[in-house]
Amino acid sequence: MLLKVDNATKRFGGLVANDHLNIEIEKGSIVGLIGPNGAGKSTIFKSICGFNRIDEGNIFFNDQRITHKETYKIARLGIACTFQQAQLFANITLEESVLMGAYCHQHSKKKALEIAREKIAFVGLAGHENQQVSRLNMFERKRAELAAALATQPELLLLDELFAGLVPTEVGEMRLLVKRVNEELGVTLFIVEHVLRVIMSLCTKIYVLEYGKMIAAGTPNEITSNPEVIKAYLGEDYDGTSDKRS
């Protein structure tokens, strides 16, 4: 098992954001996490990456306990993440931004630069290396953040609403790119997303959160036919093609 979340609970004061969550992700898989806004999806992502410290339970990566490890140590072990709002420094170039990710494992500037340029090309931004991040459009910025995450050479990549704000043609392109990350680079993916047609087409397993509790887990077909999931999130009129925004 590549990642195991064992009874993880996270509280913010009196609010229980994650309530005894259990998640298992096998190496090479693409797994989804869905649920209404405020369900606790981003909270568990941040806990896995080390930005939050869970109050109860444990998190294991490659059978190693990473509960409460520092973020940079978790990154060096092989976990990377992207955020809904691209977390890039606006006043530096694309190449410099991705290079920062490459230095996670590389001390050689030459090798790090080689990795950075390789990932920039992989996400389709070759030729933009010297462009300031602030001048990139949303679709380009999301691909730039993906390149920076890939430059850390992760085994597991957490994608938090990577498709948010993209127009349908961009969603299609990004979906193919994400599929290539898994198939060509061998990176295991854990995806939080409201664009359900993406989740349903990419993932072999999906977890569903509501009010911090896990209410379902299964294949896309099992999830879309689950009465509790339909009531809590999908809605009675869900036809398998529409997307959720709340």
What is the predicted function of each stretch?
Residues 2-4, 8-246:
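Glycine-rich phosphate-binding loops of nucleotide-dependent enzymes
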